[in-house]
Amino acid sequence: MLYPTRFDVIVVGGGHAGTEAALAAARMGCRTLLLSHNIETLGQMSCNPSIGGIGKGHLVKEVDALGGAMAAATDEGGIQFRILNASKGPAVRATRAQADRVLYKAAIRKRLENQPNLWLFQQAVDDLTVAGDRVTGVVTQIGLRFEAPAVVLTAGTFLNGLIHVGLEHYSAGRAGDPPAISLGQRLKELALPQGRLKTGTPPRLDARSIDFSVMTVQPGDDPVPVFSFLGSAAQHPAQLPCWMTHTNTRTHDVIRANLDRSPMYSGVIEGVGPRYCPSIEDKIHRFADKDSHNIFLEPEGLTTHEIYPNGISTSLPFDVQLEIVRSIRGLENAHILRPGYAIEYDYFDPRNLKSSLETKSIGGLFFAGQINGTTGYEEAAAQGLLAGANAALQVQGREAWCPRRDEAYLGVLVDDLITRGVSEPYRMFTSRAEYRLQLREDNADLRLTEKGRELGLVDDVRWAAFCAKREAIERETARLKTSLARPDLIPVADQERVLGKTLEREARYFELLRRPETTYASLMSLPGAPEQPETDPQVVEQLEIAAKYQGYIDRQQDEVAKQLQAESTRLPADLDYAEVRGLSKEVQQKLNLHKPETIGQAGRIQGITPAAISLLLVWLKRRDLAARSERRSA
């Protein structure tokens, strides 16, 4: 049966990628359908109960700046907030929150159900309908057909998912949910390049069976941070601490004695796991010289006794899991509520994607999230928003939005995926961004909200708040650059208190703010300082960063300007690189395989040398000269 309503965009999967994709397309005015095998699991946190972290928090802020839901839902469901790297420079500071699973999921569900232009439907998708080289819709498990010119596939770990506990295994998308076997088979038939990856999760513990008195308590920050640019600490529910304990030599002995029962080390699991979130057995094997590893006990919520022991993800048999847990200080009598497990799943080579996250081989079909080889809620949400927005733009006949590496961590993420591919689950870090000084958490809105407004992602409330903030920054910056501090009007004691030494001559307040030890608040406390100082902490933060890091930021912007020419020089999509004289066979093969969109992308493909880039530039120049000559003769 064909469903009577025709949609503009269909999103398959209701995880972090799918929910952001559906919300984005609907905000842009497209009739959007979100299909999930179970509406009750929309926005579910399948693994750890936390959002953010180094690099990841930057992505969450960018999603928020573009009108996405993740940051706001975290503010409503977050039960502990911290700023990581708070003592370091602003480029690497990152927000991280523990979230109440129930509250977070409810916040996402509320937004989905109240979003205009968005329809929800509970059915597993078994098939894609394709006409020629374009997707035309999907078919569910009961044979119900939905039609749309754009489909965003966000299948997570469900494609041919296989759960392992010891040497036992069974098909599942995650614990308690069925896998997407028919859909996985259909994608194989479409000849999309694919592979297998693996991830895992630790056993969950009952807090009532844990001795927290022997552990180190880890409270959240005070004052409590917020994630969304529109958020406030008043939105947060009650705050809870986390606790830290650690493994010991007995723990490690138990693991080593049972590695032959591990599906990872017995050859049962073929998929590659995440390097930066390894299982406890992988840690013991890879870091054999360490006799202890930290374990962080994270509460799952305000209304449950369930504890997430971050650091002991494992797929060992249950009896070994129990022995591991009870060898750890404070967990000697711990009761396991759910066993840990590993899950293998299909992913598709992201080098088969355009910068818009549309597949190169099937028009209108977009991939986002773990299907592209990434790991993490935040990476999924960012891809989902971009894929949903670009699906909507395509339906509306508008040009795709492909953020550059110097514009957003989202640009870094997508560029890494489509030019380099993945050999293991990809996780975002600040170190992956060469322009990270200008890609900070604190300025995500200044970088992206105007673009979001242009695309139709940003509503009137967010836009008004953003414009007010931007105007306040510009106004106060201008005032500081024109107001003079005169040493004859400021007592020597105040000069030394604020500036660390006396003023030798009059100076502009903006110049004084450049000094490392000087803050905006301390400057405004000087006698004769401009009246009515700015009180918005977000505005003050931008003033201080602009003053103290302007030289570094200017140098980075010069580097960006040099790189922009390569990023804006496009390569023909149908170019046969065998036609480019001088390229080696190896380079020709790689370029024909990856089909880079720009010279910049080509240069980031492994094995493509500067000499090869020079040959491409010569070819483009000759082509342009030939085209001009033809036009003149015509």
UniProtKB/Swiss-Prot annotation:
Keywords: Cytoplasm, FAD, Flavoprotein, NAD, tRNA processing. Homodimer. Heterotetramer of two MnmE and two MnmG subunits. It comes from the Bacteria. Its cofactor is FAD. Its main location: cytoplasm. FAD binds at residues 13-18. It is found in: Cytoplasm. GO terms for biological process: tRNA methylation; tRNA wobble uridine modification. NAD(+) binds at residues 273-287. The lineage of its organism: Bacteria, Pseudomonadati, Pseudomonadota, Betaproteobacteria, Rhodocyclales. It holds the Pfam family GIDA. The keyword tRNA processing applies. GO terms for molecular function: flavin adenine dinucleotide binding. NAD-binding protein involved in the addition of a carboxymethylaminomethyl (cmnm) group at the wobble position (U34) of certain tRNAs, forming tRNA-cmnm(5)s(2)U34. HAMAP family: MnmG_GidA. This is tRNA uridine 5-carboxymethylaminomethyl modification enzyme MnmG. SUPFAM superfamilies: FAD/NAD(P)-binding domain (SSF51905). Belongs to the MnmG family. The keyword ATP-binding does not apply. GO terms for cellular component: cytosol.
